[in-house]
């Protein structure tokens, strides 16, 4: 049986864009990531040897010349970074996998090491764990996936007024299998036509000629809680470092690392002008969009010149409701994940790998959705909430 991950490009674009910034600005940063399965009753421990075998396959991969040439052709990738990737591989020594001694059936997966050398682990590891689970606990039925995908496409295309609704695939980490992901994308592109704008997956973007999409993830801004000059200024430091790296390119800022209130407090006129838009990834998307529009208008910036990217738990119905609500008031883009890549019948797993430490200091995300925060230091979490004025129910 071939390995699940066949290419180091089989990951999200933002891993490479963040990795490039790390190489140029924080090559010595040390980090720790931790795996968590939020779905109760999932016995991953019985498949730990299979998962471990797949990790061995992942760590044996190198970038091919063809893959490096592809990356070199992306306007925001710098030659020295692509040259570095030519020497790169994921090293198993930074990863620890074991069955939990605390909770029967759970696994413990920790990643510790240089940020530069561990940042590419997360997405393929999640894809591996998903696929190992589903191929052992369910029967693959692509006909169900095809029928459900067709219904979603017809739902959008059957209504007028959605001609400029931009939809992208963001589903690599939660996919049912690589096989389904590979089949899904051409079907989606054919069905949606001009509504389909690309994928976050670099491998499939290369294979099919789609636009690879993505900018930054939570881990990037979280790390600045340890890298920045002081905690209160960590978000500003992260955004300024991004601006230094990309000089106006890749200008979508993530708004929910320490909550929307703190983000808007930091996102001043300078950032409003500099960045192309913002991404929503937790909390009520309608309230979020209204507040973003009000914030832009308060700085005398026309929201119609900025893009609001929605990427939190979307399905086609939610995409259509959001599009109708905000159309004409701003530019819109939608990143759809699990609803596309893991809707074949079995219940998708809620699994994540989150950064929990940087340079020995705890870091955390204070999401706009209760229960999504993840930190191994309750005292730090309390302090972080206090510094950014975030209530304890987040």
Curated annotation (Swiss-Prot):
Disulphide linkage map: none
Gene Ontology terms: cellular component: cytosol
Key words of the record: Ligase, Phosphoprotein, Pyridine nucleotide biosynthesis
Modified residues (Phosphohistidine): 218
Assigned EC number: 6.3.4.21
Enzyme class (EC, first level): ligase
Listed Gene3D superfamilies: nicotinate phosphoribosyltransferase
A Gene Ontology BP annotation from the UniProt entry: NAD biosynthetic process via the salvage pathway
InterPro entries linked to this entry: N/Namide_PRibTrfase, NAPRTase_N, Nic_PRibTrfase, Nic_PRibTrfase-Fam, Nicotinate_pribotase-like_C
MF (Gene Ontology): nicotinate phosphoribosyltransferase activity
Catalysed reaction, written as an equation: nicotinate + 5-phospho-alpha-D-ribose 1-diphosphate + ATP + H2O = nicotinate beta-D-ribonucleotide + ADP + phosphate + diphosphate
Modification after translation (UniProt): Transiently phosphorylated on a His residue during the reaction cycle. Phosphorylation strongly increases the affinity for substrates and increases the rate of nicotinate D-ribonucleotide production. Dephosphorylation regenerates the low-affinity form of the enzyme, leading to product release.
Family, similarity comment: Belongs to the NAPRTase family.
Function: Catalyzes the synthesis of beta-nicotinate D-ribonucleotide from nicotinate and 5-phospho-D-ribose 1-phosphate at the expense of ATP.
Stored HAMAP family: NAPRTase (MF_00570)
Protein name per its UniProtKB record: Nicotinate phosphoribosyltransferase
Species whose genome carries this gene: Xylella fastidiosa (strain 9a5c)
């Amino acid at each position: 049986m071939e390995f699940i991950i066949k290419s180091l490009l089989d990951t999200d674009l933002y891993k490479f864009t963040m990795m490039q910034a790390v190489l140029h600005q924080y090559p010595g940063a040390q980090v720790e990531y931790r795996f968590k399965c939020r779905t109760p009753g999932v016995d991953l421990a019985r498949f730990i040897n299979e998962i471990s075998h797949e990790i061995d396959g992942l760590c044996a991969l190198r970038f091919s010349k063809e893959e490096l040439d592809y990356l070199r052709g992306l306007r925001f990738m710098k030659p020295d970074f692509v040259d570095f990737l030519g020497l790169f591989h994921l090293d198993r020594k930074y990863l620890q996998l074991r069955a939990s001694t605390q909770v029967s059936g759970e696994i413990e997966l920790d990643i510790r090491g240089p940020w530069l050398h561990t940042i590419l682990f997360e997405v393929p590891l999640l894809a591996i764990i998903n696929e190992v689970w589903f191929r052992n606990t369910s029967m693959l039925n692509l006909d169900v996936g095809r029928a459900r995908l067709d219904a979603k496409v017809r739902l959008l295309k059957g209504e007028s007024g959605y001609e400029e609704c931009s939809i992208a695939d963001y589903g690599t980490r939660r996919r049912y299998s690589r096989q389904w992901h590979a089949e899904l994308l051409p079907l989606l592109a054919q069905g949606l036509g001009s509504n389909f704008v690309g994928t976050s997956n670099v491998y499939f973007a290369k294979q099919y000629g789609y636009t690879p999409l993505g900018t930054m993830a939570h881990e990037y801004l979280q790390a600045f809680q340890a890298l920045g000059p002081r905690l209160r200024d960590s978000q500003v430091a992260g955004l300024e470092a991004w601006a230094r790296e990309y000089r106006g390119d890749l200008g979508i800022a993530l708004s929910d690392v320490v909550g929307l209130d703190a983000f808007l407090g930091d996102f001043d006129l300078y950032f409003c002008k500099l960045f192309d838009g913002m991404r929503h990834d937790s909390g009520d998307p309608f309230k979020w969009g209204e507040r973003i529009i009000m914030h832009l208008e308060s700085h005398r910036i026309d929201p119609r010149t900025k893009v609001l990217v929605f990427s939190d738990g979307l399905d086609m119905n939610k995409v259509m409701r959001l599009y109708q609500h905000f159309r004409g008031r701003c530019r819109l883009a939608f990143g759809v994940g699990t609803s596309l890549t893991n809707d074949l019948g079995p219940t998708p797993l809620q699994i994540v790998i989150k950064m929990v430490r940087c340079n020995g200091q705890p870091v955390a995300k204070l999401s706009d959705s209760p229960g999504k925060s993840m930190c191994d230091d309750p005292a730090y979490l309390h302090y972080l909430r206090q510094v950014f004025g975030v209530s304890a129910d987040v």
